[in-house]
């Protein structure tokens, strides 16, 4: 009977197709599953690495599962993982509404759910570690205002805003912050389109079509650096030189930093990936022990993060920063792929 049980567990694990683990039984506090929405961009792949290492430092093994941008697959992963009774589930949702039943099932089974990056506010969770996404949009707006001012002598012109997938709260919050800050400048016309599923080819097609119908676009604002790559390619194919049509992005990935160095992109507003990941490990022991988290300011890799108690649960918001040609090589930006060497300090 013991042999059959072990075999069934092994089959279940194989069916889950883990992307990365620190090694079976390598840690003494148990296993955590990280449900990744996709591995199509460097933010997601680097998040797997840093989350795995951060949890390892505090005694947990991590297994990461790729949902391949499919809500049905992510919900199936929830069902499979719940049966394995892990210490916790870390979730970066494909779609913030569709995944709610999975969250509720896990918590009903006594498994804490920690939300990483893609905020969910419609159902209770045990912890949320996010960038200040509305603030990212606000910072982008301030940077864009400066770029338009430098070009025209006043804040005016035409901006193409390319969202990610509209099912992702990350992009909707950036849009909210950006457009709220731009309302004070009625001479700026903003054209908004969404790159469904965060597909880079969709962003390229949007840019190509809009440059045909609106050849006087001054600036293109994309909500992730991997979307900026095809946009820069379209600009080059149309005979544009770096800076002819300005480009701003908002997550700080390596490809975005490279575009800054090459002159195609003027600003990246960084999403603080490393701090968001480390924060999960800082709080995990208290979450697993079902201890109350004290609201307040916490130092996360030198950033002042604010923990508040929201209707959906404890919410840690971490600030981003603008990256330009002047500071693009700063190692604190995750896009330079230099993970933090500072040991994780669990919250007591």
Question: Can you name each region flagged by the protein language model?
Answer:
Residues 97-135, 146, 150-158, 253-261, ...:
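Flexible loop/hinge segments that line or gate small-molecule binding clefts
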Residues 90-108, 178, 196-259:
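Hydrophobic alpha-helical
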Residues 31-58, 62-80, 84, 92-96, ...:
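Extracytoplasmic "Venus flytrap"
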Residues 62-85, 192-213, 228-230:
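Structural motif
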Residues 56-67, 158-161, 179-197:
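Short beta-strand elements in bilobed, periplasmic/extracellular small-molecule ligand-binding domains
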Residues 43-58, 136-143, 169-188, 206, ...:
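Short, solvent-exposed amphipathic alpha-helices that sit
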Residues 74, 129-156, 173, 202-204, ...:
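Hydrophobic alpha-helical segments within soluble ligand-binding/sensing domains
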Residues 28-30, 162-166, 181-182, 283-348:
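Hinge/cleft segment of the Venus flytrap/periplasmic-binding protein
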């Amino acid at each position: 009977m013991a042999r059959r049980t072990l075999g069934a567990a092994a089959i279940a694990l194989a069916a889950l197709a883990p992307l990365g683990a620190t090694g079976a039984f390598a840690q003494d506090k148990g296993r955590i599953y990280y449900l990744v929405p996709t591995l199509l961009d460097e933010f997601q792949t680097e998040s797997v690495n840093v989350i795995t290492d951060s949890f390892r430092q505090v005694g947990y093994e991590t297994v990461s599962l790729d949902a391949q941008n499919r809500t049905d697959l992510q919900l199936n992963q929830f069902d499979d993982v719940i049966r394995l009774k892990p210490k916790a589930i870390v979730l970066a949702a494909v779609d913030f509404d569709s995944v709610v039943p999975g969250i509720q099932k896990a918590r009903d089974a006594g498994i804490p759910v920690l939300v990483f990056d893609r905020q969910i506010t419609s159902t209770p969770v045990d912890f949320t570690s996010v960038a200040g996404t509305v603030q990212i949009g606000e910072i982008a707006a301030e940077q864009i205002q400066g770029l338009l001012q430098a070009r025209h002598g006043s804040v005016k012109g035409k901006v193409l805003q390319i969202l990610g997938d509209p099912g992702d709260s990350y992009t909707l919050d950036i849009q909210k912050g950006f457009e709220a800050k731009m309302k004070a400048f009625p001479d700026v016309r903003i054209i908004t389109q969404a790159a469904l599923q965060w597909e880079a080819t969709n962003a390229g097609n949007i840019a190509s079509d809009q440059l045909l119908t609106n050849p006087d676009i001054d600036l293109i604002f994309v909500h992730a650096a991997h979307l900026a790559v095809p946009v820069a390619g379209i600009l080059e194919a149309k005979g544009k030189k770096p800076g002819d049509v300005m480009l701003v992005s908002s997550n700080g990935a390596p490809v975005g930093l490279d575009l800054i160095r090459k002159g195609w992109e003027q600003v990246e507003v960084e999403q603080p990936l490393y701090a968001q990941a480390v924060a999960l490990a800082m709080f995990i022991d208290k979450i697993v022990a079902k201890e109350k988290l004290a609201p307040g300011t916490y130092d996360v890799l030198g950033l002042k993060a604010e923990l508040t108690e929201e209707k959906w649960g404890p919410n840690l918001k971490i600030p981003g920063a603008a990256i330009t040609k002047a500071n693009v090589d700063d190692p604190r930006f995750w896009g330079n792929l230099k993970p933090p060497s500072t040991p994780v300090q669990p919250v007591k």
